[in-house]
Design a protein with these regions (language model features):
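Catalytic nucleophile-loop/oxyanion-hole region of alpha/beta-hydrolase
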Residues: 9-11, 16, 29-65
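Active-site nucleophile elbow and catalytic-triad environment of alpha/beta-hydrolase enzymes
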Residues: 94-98, 132-154
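A fold-wide structural signal in alpha/beta-hydrolase
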Residues: 22-32, 69, 107
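Acidic catalytic loop of the alpha/beta-hydrolase fold
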Residues: 116-117, 163-166
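Short beta-strand/loop motif that positions the catalytic acidic residue
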Residues: 152, 157-160, 164
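Alpha/beta-hydrolase active-site loop signature
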Residues: 5, 35, 115
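Primarily recognizes the serine-hydrolase "nucleophile elbow" in alpha/beta-hydrolase
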Residues: 49-124, 140
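Active-site glycine-rich loops that stabilize anionic/oxyanionic intermediates
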Residues: 2-7, 162
Length: 166
């Protein structure tokens, strides 16, 4: 999932990254998810639908369903992490007509993700994601994904370096 502050999806975090994975023998899929004016949970549902599609077509595409790993950059990291922490939410499976296990990622690589909606938030990303709901403190807190981690969250490699200006 490329980043872009939920306003766009970055080209530099899409095909160049996928090509590196392909060169190493991995499958790679780029999700160009919906951004502003789209609102939560549309992008999350699109990512969940993509994971379910890959699981459904695993034999056809020669995918090891034990190794479906999400990678997301910046706001795309928030999106990937969202599926990682929310995959068991019933609204996802019900909306897509699948089981929760079909949308569960096996792991995540979160690359300088937008994670917190608290003190150190990249507020622009959350304003674009939530729209008018940004003013609802409970909805902002729900999107502060460091508060949503549970025993059901897949294993995660998370990395940051310098400030990400989105």
């Amino acid at each position: 999932c490329p980043g872009g502050g939920y306003t766009m999806t970055s080209d530099r975090e899409a095909e160049p990254i996928a090509m590196q994975y392909l060169a190493k023998g991995y499958h790679a899929v780029i999700l160009r998810y919906s951004v502003e004016p789209a609102r939560y949970p549309l992008a999350l549902l699109q990512l969940a639908k993509t994971v379910a599609f890959l699981r459904k077509h695993a034999e056809e595409f020669h995918i090891n369903t034990d190794k479906i790993i999400l990678q997301g950059f910046s706001a795309g990291g928030h999106l990937a992490a969202s599926l990682g922490v929310f995959w068991k939410k019933s609204f996802i499976a019900e909306t897509l007509g699948v089981t929760s296990e079909m949308v569960k990622p096996n792991g995540m690589i979160l690359s300088y993700p937008v994670i917190t909606s608290g003190e150190f938030a990249h507020t622009g990303s959350f304003e674009c994601l939530l729209g008018d709901d940004y003013n609802d403190a409970d909805k902002r807190k729900e999107q502060s994904l460091e508060l949503q981690v549970s025993a059901d969250t897949p294993q995660t490699f998370l990395w940051h370096t310098v400030t990400d200006d989105c």
